[in-house]
Amino acid sequence: MHPDQADTAAMQQQTTTECSDRSRPEKAEEGHAREHTVTRTCSREPEQTATATKPTGLKLICLTTAICLTIFLISVDFSILATAIPAITAEFKSVADIGWYGSSYLLTTASSQLLLGKCYTVFDLKWTFLLALLTFEVGSIICATAPSSVVLIIGRAIAGCGNAGLLSGALLILTHSVPLEKRPLFMAMTGGTYGVAAIAGPPLGGVFTDKLSWRWCFWINLPIGALTFLVIVFLFKSPPRSGFDGSRSWLAKVMRFDPVGTLMFMPAIICVLLALQWGGTTHAWNSGIVVALLVVGGVLVIAFGIVQWLMHDDATIPLRIIKKRTIWACAAYQFALGAAFFVFIYFLPIWFQGVQGASAIQSGVRTLPMLVGNIVATAVSGVLVTIIGYYAPFMILGTILASVGAGLLLLFTPNVTAASWIGYQAIVGLGIGFGWQQPFVAVQTVLDIKDVPIATATLSFAQTLGGTLFVSVAQTAFSTKLTQELVSQVPQLDPASILHEGGAAELDKLVPEQYLPDVVLSYNNSLLSAFFVATIMAIMSLVGCTFVEWNSVKGKKADAVPAA
C-alpha cells in the first residue's frame, strides 16, 4: 500500500472511531472519583465528499436560489388562502367546505411525508424531488382552474402530496451542495425565506384577491416552480443512491418501502386529523364518529410502532435512527415550536381583524414585526453557528424568547398599544428564528449522510404535524371560549350567528352597534385561549433543546458538564 493511502486509511479509521464514540461515557483517570461524559463531534461525511464535489460560485448561488424558491412555494401556499377564502366561498357558494380547503392539503402532506423521505433514500434525489415538484404544480393548476369547490379540494389534496416531498428534498439538495460547517448559514437563508413567505402569504393573497382574482394564489406557483425545475435539472448532480439490489426478490424490493407500516400510518394520521378537525365544531367531542376516529387512529399508531420495531432498517423510521437522543429531541423540538408558530400565523391576523377592525391586507401588514424578528434571528443564528460551530445554545435561546413573547401576547386587550403588539410579536419572531433551523443542522451533524433523508423527513413531518394538530386544538379552544363569552356577555345574541355566519372582519355588520364593544371583548378573550395553546407549546419545546447533544459542525471536541 502506498504511504499516502495508508495515512488516509488510518485517518478514516480514526474518524470512524471518534464518531461511534460520540456519546460513550468514559471512566476518569485513576484517582478521580467520578466519571464524566465526553461528547465527541465530527463531520459524518468523508472529507473528499465535503470539499471536492460541492458546487461553488454562480452554480451554488443558482442552486441556493432554487432551494429558497422551493421553500417559498411550500410556505406561502400554506398561508396565502387565509385572505382568499371569502372570495372562493362567494364564487362557489361553499361556506360548508371552508375547512376542507386547508385540511385536504394538510392531510395528504402529513400522511405522505415519511413515505417520500423513504423514497429519497432509495431513488435518485434529483428526479424524486422533481416528481414531487411536478405533482405540486399539477395540483396548483387544478386549483387555479377549478370550476367547483369539489375540484378545488381535489387539487389541494394533490398539491399536498407534492408538498410532502418538497421541504425534505430541498434540504437534502442543500445538504449535498454545501459542506457541513457552512450549512448553518445556508440553512438560515432557507429559514428566513420560510418565515417571510408564511407571514407574507395572507397580505399577498389579499392583494391577488382584491386586484386580480383568488385564482392567482395558485397561478403564482407555476413560474416559480418552472424556474426551480430548470435550475435543478441542469445544475444539480445527484449523489449515488442504493437503488434496488438486483439479487433481491420482488417482495424484498417492495418491503424496502415498508408498505405495511405505510398502510397503517397514513390512515392513522388521517383519522386523528379528522377527529381534531370535526371535534367540537362539526360534531361533538363525545359523538360516535369523533370517538371512533380517535380510537382507530390510536390503535393504528400503536400498530405502526410495532411494525417499525419488526422491520429494522427497512422501517419507514428505523429505530436505530429515532433512538438517537439528538434525533428524537430535535423532532420533539420541531413539533412544539412548529405548533406555536403556526397557531400564531393563523390567529394573529384574526385578532387584528376581529378586535382592531383591520382589513385582510392590513392584518397581514401588522404581523410584519414577527416576520422582521424571524428574519433577523435566522440570519444572526446562521452566521454565529457557522463561526462557533454549536447549534444547541440557539435552540435554547429560541425556546426562551418564543415562550416569553408568547406569554406577553396573552396580555393583549382591545386597547393594547401599537408599541406593545409590535414588540411582543418581534420577541416571538426572534425566538422562532433562532431555533427554527437548528434541528436540521443537528441531524446532519450526528448522522451518516445516508441516514439524513429519513431524519430530515421526520423533522419536516414533526413540523407539519405539530402545526396541523395544534391549529385544530387552538381553533376548538377559541370556538368554545367564544361561545361561553357571548352567552355570558351578550345573551341577547345567538353565538351561532357570530361563529358561522361571518368572519372576524364582519363583526360590525353582524352585530348591532350597542353590543359591538362586548362582542369585541369576547373575541379578544377567546383568541387569548388560542394564544395560550401556542404559549404552552413554545414552553414545551424546552424538552427538545434540553436533551439535544452539544455537537459542533466544525468537528471539534467538547466536554459535557461533569456528571454528579
From Swiss-Prot:
Q: What is this protein called?
A: Aspyridones efflux protein
User: Which species is listed as the source?
Assistant: Neocamarosporium betae (Beet black rot fungus)
Q: Which family does it belong to?
A: Belongs to the major facilitator superfamily. TCR/Tet family.
Per UniProt, what is the name of the gene that codes for the protein in this document? TP
GO CC term, one of those recorded: plasma membrane
- Principal location listed in the UniProt entry: membrane
Basic and acidic residues composition bias: which ranges? 19-47
GO function terms (MF aspect): transmembrane transporter activity
Q: Which SUPFAM superfamilies match?
A: MFS general substrate transporter
Organism classification = Eukaryota, Fungi, Dikarya, Ascomycota, Pezizomycotina
Question: Where in the cell is the protein located?
Answer: Cell membrane
